[in-house]
Amino acid sequence: MNQRFSLAYCLALTFAWAAGAQAGGGPENLFLVVNALSPDSVAVANAYADLRGIPPINVLMLPWRESTESVSIATFRSDLLDPVLKAIDGRRLAPQINCVVYSSDFPWRIDFAEELPAALKTQELHKFPSGSLTGMTMLYGAVRSGQGPVWLDPQSNRYWRPLDSQGVPKSTDGFQGWHRYGSQGEVTEDSGNRYLLSVMLGVTAGRGNSVPEIVRGLEASAAADGTQPPGTIYFVTNEDVRTKTRSPAFPPIVRAIEDLGVKAEVVSGVLPTARRDVAGLMMGTADFDWPASKSTILPGAICENLTSLGGIFTPSAGQTPLSAFIRAGAAGSSGTVIEPYA
């Protein structure tokens, strides 16, 4: 996929990054947004703020009265994104904020049909023009630009690292929200795009998780920080197109992980079977039953299932949602809220 409008749903920093805080920094580098009208949102945020030591000045209590599933981009821009960014600026936190963390009971899908050019509206690719809350927050500059849906450009995320011939990033670069990134991902002084990492602590509506499930995950992830538990990162391959198209890149990625002193393995099947050391996972299947695998997800693990509807929490959506990983003990996961670019 060249571009995915995916919902990052993490326990560690989020329900992930805030967990170990390497990618986005420490508690002073994130901004926590809470739906002040939702007891679930407040409960999840309180648990997270306590576990992570979030300063009160880095918390915004926002009374969200709109849908907690989907809203128009105009509503997102005026009633959610702009108030968040204005609060960050008003509190003089902009130089230090790298990540916007949403608690539960905010919309996970942003509908931008009203801003789609007429020439694109007839294309099957844009039949359901939507982006995720976290993806559209990361691309806040494009969303606020007034230049049309420039976020549709597959190259809109310039923080993405270019890959070498083996499919492994050529280099890595610690993220800073005040950095500007050029067309090749290079940090520039006065040109290029700025971004903000963004995650959700959880979704408590529809096919999401319960508040106790989310809080248990937050607690387990916090307890795992810095412990470097022994475990294995698994890459699952089978005849499903979701894995076949990516499996050639698995061996070099496994080697790169092992060069860091972490075990990694390519396994065949739908899920890792009877593995008690799942420290990370990449797989691809429409539906799965994790308990039936008899495998154990370790605290702090990031688990990904590359499929079309994993980030959709509408009860009738179909396909297994990413919340199944959280329920099984994963620290974080992500999923698309609309069919991604292939």
Predicted regions and their residues:
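N-terminal secretory signal peptides that target proteins for export/translocation
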Residues: 1-3
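Generic early N-terminus positional signal peaking at residue ~5-7
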Residues: 5-6, 141
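Cysteine-dependent hydrolase recognition
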Residues: 23-342
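Bacterial N-terminal signal peptides
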Residues: 6-18
